[in-house]
Amino acid sequence: MPSHPKSSFFPTLDSLVIITSLAFCLRLFAVLPSSFPLNDGGMFYTMVQDIQAAGFKLPMFTSFNSSLIPFAYPPLSLYVTALLNTLPLPLLSLFRFLPLVVSTLTVPAFFLLAKQVLKSKDVLLATLIFTLLPRSFEWQIMGGGITRSFGQLFSILTLAYSAKFFRQSSKTYFLISSLLLALTIISHLELTFFAVSSLIFLTLHFTPNFSGIKKVSAIILTSLILTSPWWMLILARHGLSPFLNAAASGLQAFDPTSYTLFLTLSSVTDEVFLPVLGTLTLLGLVVTIQKRAWWLLSWFYLPIIIAPRNFLNFIVVPMSLVITHAVTSLLLPFFTHIIKPFSFRSLLALLIIPLYLLVSAIAFILPGNRYFDSVSSSEKTAIEWVKQYTPPNSRFLILSPQIFSSWGMDSLLEWFPALSQRISLATPQGTEWLPNHEFRLRKKLHQKIKGCYLQDPSCLESIFSSPTFRSLPIFQYILISRDNSLLSQACEVCLLTQQLQNSPRYKSVYQNPQVTIFSFSP
């Protein structure tokens, strides 16, 4: 692969700084409107506190939601956060801004990877595409991005330096690659699987022979040795069970053919307007087939197999490369042909797509994006009351305004047990590490509770008497949060709230403009 001429180094560096600054601004403007971490992260918040309470020793279990969840999660970013919190840096502020900073660093990391697998003239374009893809940062800048951002950064750097090692067989690059993969392992398990399997496809591209297999094996083995103090301790404490349970919880059927067609929908690339990047991905796949770039085509479909639950967050790296192929092989030649002779009108035609993508990215981060919901000030006030005035181990049902969102997008559902130190019966987070299909049970419970929003209280009570949920203890409190911005249009929980207020078995024990809490007497 041709290297950059020395004369072009500084212009390239300047362009990279501009693109990275754009990435930082996009992330910052998404985070700033909320005074609380975006969306999820409550379980990791508790785990950081568990580490601090244990004197920075690795706890055996996390106290999150009083569920006896094994502390088997890769702990690197949690320890980094716990250490930074010893400085005058509030923990909630770290959960707001640390993922933002680490996620921004993935842009120059991707640049290093693109330099190894693309022509020099295409590298900055690929980096810009990666920057403008919402999937490259939306889940990384949330509160839960405290782990995802570290995993994404180290996995991309692993691929970049491994590609250098495959090309040059340098001991230095071998050691760096092994160290970076080790950091990925102790940051995020799913991204570890993505990095390891991606190494195989990079080997097919650079060294498709037995020598390449030996290089990949050496990197993986060395990284396992480097991380052995952690995973051997986890195996000694809990065995393989937590990892097998977590892996099983993520498995679900997915049809790659349907997925390819699904790219034309904006829900895959999370574009606000037309799915331009999704369409370019389809065109890029055609180009990769035409060029016989089977390694890239296979890499593109890899996340569907290894991480079916979260593959859209991992596919962004090969997707950016595929889109780059579409632009350089189809769009640029087309525009070059139609804009001759050069004029202001032709320049405008050439810039219309990148300008559109920039506008789309800016629109994505505007307030109101469902991905960037967070716990409100009224909800925080209610949670503080719960922590102060309800008995320890009290059991709650959380009825949040996100009736049409999945459990993973319900910020109150995860942050309530973290901040109140009380039990939320329908919170699935963390239960993927538990046996007996606990994760599936909690997800089902969450869905069942949503089905009771427009019914009377007996709907909630009947859930716990059904055979499926009979093993769970019944709730003692119900916390209902309303979206006041929608009260003039719809209020899914208003009917249930009125029913609870009129029932002799329920007593309103707390109320503020958004939240009402009821105690329940069976």
What are these model-predicted stretches?
Residues 16, 20-156, 189, 193, ...:
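Active-site lumenal/periplasmic loops and adjacent helix-entry segments of GT-C-fold
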Residues 220-224, 327-364:
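Signature aromatic-anchored transmembrane alpha helix within multi-pass, membrane-resident enzymes
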